[in-house]
């Protein structure tokens, strides 16, 4: 039997081809996480400003408690 020949029932060649196509297809399915306008979906600056605003509101609420 030759080194490059498929197995007895021919499944080795199919398995190799299927594995190769699945591996190649995985690269095409990866898409960048972005919104409709091209900006990133998750804005860390927005999170920062919301966190600061929340802290200020909580501080003022606790400070002015009777």
From Swiss-Prot:
Membrane topology annotation: Single-pass membrane protein
UniProt cross-references to Pfam families, sorted A to Z: ALN
Protein's UniProt keywords contain Membrane: yes
Parts of the chain that traverse the membrane: 45-65
Subcellular location: Endoplasmic reticulum membrane
Keyword 4Fe-4S: no
In-chain residues carrying the UniProt-annotated modification N-acetylmethionine: 1
Origin superkingdom: Eukaryota
Main location: endoplasmic reticulum
Keywords: Acetylation, Endoplasmic reticulum, Membrane, Transmembrane, Transmembrane helix
Gene Ontology CC annotations of this record: endoplasmic reticulum membrane
Compositional bias (Basic and acidic residues): 9-20
Region (Disordered): 1-37
Classification via InterPro entries: ALN
Xref: PANTHER family: CHROMOSOME 4 OPEN READING FRAME 3 (PTHR37367:SF1)
Assembly mode: Homooligomer. Can also form heterooligomers with other sarcoplasmic/endoplasmic reticulum calcium ATPase (SERCA) regulators ERLN, PLN, SLN and STRIT1/DWORF. Monomer. Interacts as a monomer with ATP2A2/SERCA2; the interaction results in inhibition of ATP2A2 Ca(2+) affinity.
Known role: Inhibits the activity of the calcium ATPases ATP2A2/SERCA2 and ATP2A3/SERCA3 by decreasing their apparent affinity for Ca(2+).
Name of this protein: Sarcoplasmic/endoplasmic reticulum calcium ATPase regulator ARLN
Upper lineage: Eukaryota, Metazoa, Chordata, Craniata, Vertebrata
């Amino acid at each position: 039997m030759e080194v490059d020949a498929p197995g007895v029932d021919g499944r080795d060649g199919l398995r190799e081809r299927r594995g190769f196509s699945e591996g190649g297809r995985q690269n095409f399915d990866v898409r960048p996480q972005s919104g409709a306008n091209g900006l990133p979906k998750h804005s860390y600056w927005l999170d920062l400003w919301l966190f600061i605003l929340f802290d200020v509101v909580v501080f003022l609420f606790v400070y002015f408690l009777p």
